[in-house]
Amino acid sequence: MKKNALINAELSYVVATLGHTDEITICDAGLPIPDETQRIDLALIPGVPTFIDTVKAVLGEMQIEGVVMAEEFAQVSPDLHQALIALIRNEELLCGKKITLSYVSHEAFKVHTQDSKAVIRTGECTPYANVIFQSGVVF
């Protein structure tokens, strides 16, 4: 469910049309995107936009209640993983609701992206910098 204004029309539309428990994926430049899933490709050059900047933009717009990440993310890219966790914890404070964190293998994560309404590709080149957000409600 949508919260605020977002400049990217395609991304704004996807967020505005999410129902409760619908999912979107924000991914690094290398994650394979299923053919049947809508691709919103924001990547310009390596590192632009960053994973974190994209997450911030989406969190400013989308109410989330659940998060799925690959187990490998925390192990291989701990700094970026911690930055994401900090943003999620801040989101919990802002919305006053608990956000569920789940971890799966990277292979299971890739399969799970097939259930996403859209996959948002960033220019991030940090390994395993991928997250699935499950839509919550603002009420």
From Swiss-Prot:
Pathway: Carbohydrate metabolism; D-ribose degradation; D-ribose 5-phosphate from beta-D-ribopyranose: step 1/2. The active site is at residue 20. One of its GO terms (cellular component) is cytosol. It is found in: Cytoplasm. Gene3D superfamilies: RbsD-like domain. Its main location: cytoplasm. Its EC number is 5.4.99.62. It catalyses: beta-D-ribopyranose = beta-D-ribofuranose. Pfam families: RbsD_FucU. The keyword NAD does not apply. InterPro entries: D-ribose_pyranase, RbsD-like_sf, RbsD_FucU. GO terms for biological process: D-ribose catabolic process. Substrate binds at residues 28, 106, 128-130. Keywords: Carbohydrate metabolism, Cytoplasm, Isomerase. GO terms for molecular function: D-ribose pyranase activity; intramolecular lyase activity; monosaccharide binding. The keyword Isomerase applies. Catalyzes the interconversion of beta-pyran and beta-furan forms of D-ribose. Homodecamer. PANTHER family: D-RIBOSE PYRANASE. Belongs to the RbsD / FucU family. RbsD subfamily. This is D-ribose pyranase.
